[in-house]
Amino acid sequence: MKPRLAFVALALAVATRLAGQTPAARFDSTRLDSVVQYLRSQVDSAFPGAVVAVGDHNRIALLAAVGHYGLDDPRPMTTETVFDLASLTKVIGLTTACILLVDQKKLDLDAPVQRYLPEFRGAGKEKVTIRHLLTHSSGLPAWRPLFRETETREAALALVDTTPLDTVPGARYLYSDLGAIVLTQVVEHITKTRIDQYLDTAVFKPLGMTTTRYLPPVEWRDRIAPTEMDTAFRHRMIRGEVHDENTGRLGGISGHAGLFSTGPDLARFAMWLLNQGSPSSSVLLRSSPSLVKQFTTRQDLPPGSSRALGWDTPSENSSAGSKVSAHAFGHTGFTGTSIWLDPDRDLFIILLTNRVHPTRANTKILKVRPHVADLVVDAVTDQRP
């Protein structure tokens, strides 16, 4: 089967599940219902509303919405609600771009960042590699308030590129938005195009992800879940524009945050990840379907870190819960989003919420995510070790 036709078949499988068919036989429908009931119990406590999507490599077994949009919008959420993905951008967008560029022999994981980005200057930075950036072991600080320190995108990027290292590369794990911003520039230098344009052409359109993008248009606003009252930067309720302040300073476009998407679109993406080695995997990858496994395998850099390349893997007190396999991989987003995939069980778990509405002080999502993951794993009837 030709790659394009193979993916059409995959997309039709998605459409079938979206039409409201009963769950696939390998999922216990009663247990899936318990996932939805649990999420309903968390409405107006952990979040105003949520969308959950569960499935395997070729079908969606559960797609449900609970709750409402927010304080000033009592309309019920729907499965087509658009969410600010926050740091899911790092894996859905930035990491996927890196996978494609490695596949095309345009990006070397162990090459110094300076090979691609000479502007990345400072003591010790010549030793920072692409792998360091992807594993959050570059030595860069976690964050700095670019939205306060600079007035333009260009000035913000220059400040990131010249930020001193805190530690020797590879010596410490520290989750770093700054590292992701540097890696965004690497992708843009290689592709000679802005990352939003590259991802739209190279990833989202080929996968049929029609509601995944940066800078959502005004006409989408009523479908977008509101996030937070921004008291630090823009001084208004944020809806339809990126929640992350630094991404706001960068014009709404960055590899560390900025993407908006829906449950059905992310399910399409998850199915592509779980389909590696099948004809549909070649929709994006030319020669190396094993690259997804490489990027989603724990790197042990530095020793003891749970990080894969871009992705995270299960660890103690992880948002993945306690029942996914050791080969699972996933990520979370500050706004209340998460995605976990378990290739051993042929399973994906997507949870999208706007838990920061109206304030980020609500952290109950930290208990909701692992409980949802455990409930979903319990619903898989053909359990594998």
Model-identified regions with their sequence ranges:
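Short, surface-exposed loop or secondary-structure junction motifs
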Residues: H68-G70, A123-A328
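Short, conserved catalytic-motif segment at the N-terminal edge
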Residues: A25-L85, K106-D108, A155-A158, T162, ...
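Short active-site loop at a secondary-structure junction
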Residues: S41-A53, D72-H132, L165-G179, S254-A257
